[in-house]
Structure formats: structure tokens, C-alpha cells
Amino acid sequence: MFKYIGDIVKGTGTQLRSLVMVFSHGFRKRDTLQYPEEPVYLPPRYRGRIVLTRDPDGEERCVACNLCAVACPVGCISLQKAETEDGRWYPEFFRINFSRCIFCGLCEEACPTTAIQLTPDFEMAEFKRQDLVYEKEDLLISGPGKNPDYNFYRVAGMAIAGKPKGSAQNEAEPINVKSLLP
């Protein structure tokens, strides 16, 4: 009999504790945001829409090395390499299918020229799936992105047609590695 009364008291206490918890949550600040009216907080390293950037001279940074397409685990990046008269590579077309992209950031890490970068933009909703396939013109932005002073062709020491290595601006003379051997 005492066990039965003890179970009733224990059950009533559990119910009262649950009611207090529910009512206390009713007076707290709400976690739900009214999205279009209230801006959403994004962490500093949020990975959103992918963009292609330009170097400080205004030319596109992408050298069509295809490393981003190889690093992509879902294969949503495709591009075709072309070459200018001075020997510089560029993508003839660059295409990203955002309906397949998982925004993992591996393409950004693989890019040697920092041409492909992820931005905090996440508003990419479309009614048709075909509109989620972005071409180079849709991805290319006018600015340098996260690395404003980086220029791959100056840093890498790439030979420019008509000029020997080491003769470009801000470029050191090449080192003869064989002379360093013992």
C-alpha cells in the first residue's frame, strides 16, 4: 500500500517538474528567427556559394589546372582549358552544378591560384534545376576575394612567352639546383 502511494507521489512530481520546464521555456528568448526580416548569423568560416576571383591586374586567376574538379567528391565541377597568345592558360568554360555541390570546400583548398573561393552567400534557391548550373560568367566576380594581393603568375615564376624566367616584375632569378649539389 505504501509502495503504491509512493509511486503516485513520484509520478505527480515528475509531471509537475515537466510542466515547470515547459512553462519556463515559454518565457525565454525564441530560437526561431523571422528570416527575411531578421538577418541570420553566419560563422566566420561558413561555406556558401562558390565564386571565381580575379588577380590584382583584373585578369581571371583560374589557370584551368583541373585540380578543383579532381578534388570534388561529387564531380559537380567541369572545365576546359584554353591558352592565350602569351602562353597563359585560362578556362574556356567553367561550370558548377550547385544541385550536386555539397559545399565541402575541397575545391577551394585544392586551387593553387586561390581563384575558386567560397563566400557566405547561401540564398541560391531556384524553381528549375537547370538554373542551378552556373557558368563562368555567373561565377566570375570583379574583385580579388579573400587574397587581394596574390598573383599566381608573379609568385610561381611561370615563364611568359617572349621572356625568360626571372625577368618579370617581382620575380627572382631562377636558381641552378645542380650547382647546390656536393
Swiss-Prot record:
Its EC number is 7.1.1.-. PROSITE patterns: 4FE4S_FER_1, 4FE4S_FER_2. Keywords: 4Fe-4S, Cell inner membrane, Cell membrane, Iron, Iron-sulfur, Membrane, Metal-binding, NAD, Quinone, Repeat, Translocase, Ubiquinone. Residues 52-82, 92-121 form the 4Fe-4S ferredoxin-type domain. One of its GO terms (molecular function) is NADH:ubiquinone reductase (non-electrogenic) activity. [4Fe-4S] cluster 2 binds at residues 72, 101, 104, 107. It is found in: Cell inner membrane. One of its GO terms (biological process) is aerobic respiration. SUPFAM superfamilies: 4Fe-4S ferredoxins. Pfam families: Fer4_7 (PF12838). InterPro entries: 4Fe4S_Fe-S-bd, 4Fe4S_Fe_S_CS, NADH_quinone_OxRdtase_chainI. It comes from the Bacteria. Its cofactor is [4Fe-4S] cluster. Binds 2 [4Fe-4S] clusters per subunit. Its main location: membrane. The keyword Transmembrane does not apply. It is a peripheral membrane protein. Coiled coil: none annotated. Belongs to the complex I 23 kDa subunit family. NDH-1 is composed of 13 different subunits. Subunits NuoA, H, J, K, L, M, N constitute the membrane sector of the complex. NDH-1 shuttles electrons from NADH, via FMN and iron-sulfur (Fe-S) centers, to quinones in the respiratory chain. The immediate electron acceptor for the enzyme in this species is believed to be ubiquinone. Couples the redox reaction to proton translocation (for every two electrons transferred, four hydrogen ions are translocated across the cytoplasmic membrane), and thus conserves the redox energy in a proton gradient. This is NADH-quinone oxidoreductase subunit I. It comes from Pseudomonas entomophila (strain L48). The gene is nuoI.
